[in-house]
Amino acid sequence: MKVKELREMTDVELRKKLADTKDELFRLRFQSATGQLDNPMKIQEVRRRIARVKTVLRERELGIKHA
């Protein structure tokens, strides 16, 4: 999901997305530990998705506007 799409979401939607993505990361790490993960790059993708959501939430806290 792109940052532009995230910025169009409400705070409630972003927090839900963050919780869902963290849960997905937990499941991927568990699969990795048990040797069942097919694509290890999925962990990196999910971590970046979490970072994007957190960045948008923090921007809103600080009142940063984007054109």
Swiss-Prot record:
Q: Does the keyword Iron apply?
A: no
Molecular function (GO) terms listed?
A: structural constituent of ribosome
Q: Which GO terms describe its biological process?
A: translation
Iron among keywords: no
- Coiled-coil annotated spans: none
- InterPro entries referenced in this protein's UniProt entry, alphabetically: Ribosomal_protein_uL29 (IPR050063), Ribosomal_uL29 (IPR001854), Ribosomal_uL29_sf (IPR036049)
The protein's matches in Gene3D superfamilies, at most eight in alphabetical order, are given as: 1.10.287.310
Could you name the domain of life of the organism this protein comes from? Bacteria
Question: Keyword annotations for this protein?
Answer: Ribonucleoprotein, Ribosomal protein
Q: Which SUPFAM superfamilies match?
A: Ribosomal protein L29 (L29p)
Quote the cellular component terms of the Gene Ontology held in the record.
cytosolic large ribosomal subunit
Family recorded in the similarity comment: Belongs to the universal ribosomal protein uL29 family.
The record's annotation in NCBIfam families points to: L29
| Protein name, per record | Large ribosomal subunit protein uL29
